Curated annotation (Swiss-Prot):
It comes from Burkholderia multivorans (strain ATCC 17616 / 249). This is Glutamyl-tRNA(Gln) amidotransferase subunit A. InterPro entries: Amidase, Amidase_CS, Amidase_dom, AS_sf, GatA. Signal peptide: none annotated. The active site is at 75 (charge relay system), 150 (charge relay system), 174 (acyl-ester intermediate). The gene is gatA.
Amino acid sequence: MHAKSLTELRAALAAKECSAVELAQHYLKRIDAARDLNAFVHVEPELTLAQAKAADAELARGAGGPLTGLPIAHKDVFVTRGWRSTAGSKMLANYESPFDATVVARLQAAGMVTLGKTNMDEFAMGSSNENSAFGAVKNPWDTNAVPGGSSGGSSAAVAARLAPAATGTDTGGSIRQPASFAGVTGIKPTYGRVSRYGMIAFASSLDQGGPMAQSASDCALLLNAMAGFDERDSTSLERDDEDFARHLGQPWAPGNDAGKPLAGLRIGLPNEYFGDGLADDVRAAIDAALKQYEALGATLVPVSLPKTELSIPVYYVIAPAEASSNLSRFDGVRFGHRAAQYGDLLDMYKKSRAEGFGPEVKRRILVGTYVLSHGYYDAYYLQAQKIRRIIANDFQEAFKSCDVIMGPASPTVAWDLGAKGDDPVQMYLADIYTLSVSLAGLPGMSVPCGFGAGANAKRPVGLQIIGNYFNEARMLQVADAFQRATDWHKQVPQVPAGV
């Protein structure tokens, strides 16, 4: 049952091959058996089964929609009423929200059943899911490897089939990179497509929620429920609702030959994505995927994104600056961790934050406070915002000669647990191909396209697909065509064994 996609599980529910309760029980059993992966931090079986019973009642009445009764896991950055919402931090270890995030509320309104909350890097700051106050997550393909971050719990849960789908958030690649490392499909929509209300903030001008699942068609199904204007989020974009699955299975252009469904599609290949630093085994998997696209009728076009190398310093000025402001609210007074022993009020602030935040969060708060301080704002933050605009303009120039842009989601496959913990800069460099997309506010996704080589033969590779603003439906069409011709997205690791 767990090998089925959301679409297949929906058909099974409709055919009464199983009930929503049976489905939930099946996944809860798998979650319990795979506790060593540490993908989940909060599971409440009674709440899950109550939601499943309600979904069965809806289905019995002939009501419900395409997602009714289907299970999903939520990244623990989305506040969820009745569940602890921790953002992977000791600061919020016992926090229970009085309301649901818009993403959670919309998926529950669509009838989905919450399986639990997934582990994550603290306050979404990290690329390996080793920065969590609740311990590191293991990659189900190779438990000596990281699952990526910051949505590593979600990527591991979907890869190990502990959940058929999960929510994630992407600030600088935190959906796409873990999707690549864990061999699942994940999409970061255009900034503003999905409401940030109830999503614990890291960097407000970059954070964006999105789905992670087995396939592009599953992601389209989820995005239909997740996306849409929300007046409670000032960054939410007011646009007409659309069906993100409307192009799936359709030719790129009317009249295309069945064997060449993507004839007319122009795929841009940035020179900067295929230079030094790209691992040979990742390059080989990406090249094979691009050959598959050529076989489907697409044309490969060279393009340039000349400011790609500046995306790392720009991101690590802007994101920490916004984080230092957003995280100032966690002071031990209103909610969150409070030190047990302290002197005056200022001492309470200091001790509560020192005890509540982990090393990476403290590092970024210090960097952010520095670049916003008097005398440095113009030199760092303002300059970074100017270069951010240039990066966005580079993409628009590239899209004049192509329909989508492709390349690796990460320069390497997943690295070993602990391999980069002593050098945060090396961790930051791993996001070189995803950061510029986030800075520009563009939609991007990662699609499984192979595995590494040699000692990395069990570690997946992800192909990144980048679209222009609001072009998610076409991106999903392009990804879906690849997945109809290949089976990388159907590969399942043997964890947990025997369940």
